[in-house]
Curated annotation (Swiss-Prot):
Active site: H44
Family: Belongs to the LDH2/MDH2 oxidoreductase family. DlgD subfamily.
UniProt binding sites for NAD(+): I168, T169, M170, V171, D172, M173, S174, W224, K225, G304, H305, E306
Gene name for this UniProt entry: dlgD
Upper lineage: Bacteria, Pseudomonadati, Pseudomonadota, Gammaproteobacteria, Enterobacterales
Source species: Escherichia coli (strain 55989 / EAEC)
Name used for this protein in its record: 2,3-diketo-L-gulonate reductase
UniProt keywords, alphabetically: Cytoplasm, NAD, Oxidoreductase
Keyword NAD applies: yes
Cited SUPFAM superfamilies: L-sulfolactate dehydrogenase-like
Major site of localization recorded for this protein: cytoplasm
Length: 332
């Protein structure tokens, strides 16, 4: 089915208000969920909203909590999210990293005791729109087996890198071949994954999203490489924030909350003049996209460039929402 941005935001806002979230916070949170969905990231927008409400009702998310600065070391700051709303706090933390970068050339905010930030790409994009390189990542509850294991002991720990090119170039990727949100999107659409995304119960690689969702044997991105990246990202976020690791979140908490996150902004214009920056970025993009195609019908894409097109299409034609997901939201 198709809905407008306004309908989507109003539905989110209604549910948040009914759960006792104050009107200003509810409006800002509903706006972020709707913007994420409008950008085409359904897995961490509309599809994720019922799960967000469940955690709100369980007390994992404290809607009136505000992040608190713990330590300041010039370009580096350490904050405690105090289990506040994840996407609103993440936006504030990237804003703070940008402020630090304006003063120091680079800004790093390490956040502990946080909640799921929903679409991580929002915060990298936020920095790139202002002319900064944006880098951020988060740890999570253990939802992926380390390479060679059958049991989940590491997080998908998504990493975002956004570059202020025209259009913005951005990688937003979990350390698994697919996020669990994208497994859900493909399952709801009745599609197999385009490439192997995990193992079945017999230990064979599979493209069946429902099987992987059930047995949790999701495949690390690049096999052992994604497994290794997940581990070191967790270590850095844990140390810099003095927060909880994947092991602590998984073993000590009843659900995924109290996680650790990193937000970095770099002011490019302190290092290179604008015309030179733009020319260098354009040359990189042209060099990549003019490579001989393996399939003449398949364009060579640059990461993140599709979001401008998706956003325009959704604004023009309406936002596609799975019927079953919309029914869940209406029933909340």
């Amino acid at each position: 089915m198709k809905v407008t941005f306004e309908q989507l935001k109003a539905a989110f806002n209604r549910v948040l208000i009914s759960r006792g979230v104050d009107s200003e916070t509810a409006d800002a949170c509903a706006e972020m969920f709707a913007r994420t969905t409008e950008s085409g990231v359904y897995s961490h927008g509309v599809n994720r909203f019922p799960r967000f409400i469940q955690q709100l009702e369980n007390g994992d998310i404290i809607p009136d909590a505000q992040p608190k600065r713990i330590t300041s070391l010039g370009a580096i700051e350490q904050w405690d999210a105090q289990r506040s709303i994840g996407n609103l706090t993440a936006k504030k933390m990237m804003d703070r990293a940008i402020e630090l970068a304006a003063d120091h050339g680079i800004g790093l905010v390490a956040l502990r005791n946080a909640n799921h930030w929903m679409r991580g790409g929002s915060y990298g994009w936020q920095a790139a729109e202002k002319g900064y390189i944006g880098i951020c990542w988060t740890n999570s509850i253990a939802v992926m087996p380390p390479w060679g294991a059958k049991e989940c002991r590491i997080g998908t720990n998504p990493l975002i890198v956004a570059i202020p090119s025209t259009p913005i170039t951005m990688v937003d990727m979990s350390m698994s071949m697919f996020s669990y949100g994208m497994l859900e999107v493909n399952r709801l659409a009745g599609r197999q994954l385009p490439v192997d995304g995990g193992f079945d119960d017999e230990g064979n690689l599979t493209k069946e999203p429902g099987v992987i969702e059930k047995n949790r044997r999701i495949l690390p991105m690049g096999y052992w490489k994604g497994s290794g990246m997940s581990i070191v990202l967790d270590m850095i976020a844990t140390l810099l924030s003095d927060g909880a690791s994947v092991a602590e979140v998984t073993q000590d908490n009843s659900d995924e909350y109290g996680i650790s996150q990193i937000f970095i902004a770099i002011e490019v214009d302190k290092l290179i003049d604008g015309p030179t920056r733009d020319a260098k970025l354009q040359r990189i993009m042209d060099y990549v996209t003019t490579a001989e195609r393996a399939d003449e019908n398949q364009a060579i894409r640059l990461p993140g460039h599709e979001f401008t097109t998706l956003l325009a299409e959704n604004r023009r034609n309406g936002i596609t929402v799975d019927d079953s997901v919309w029914a869940k939201i209406q029933a909340l």
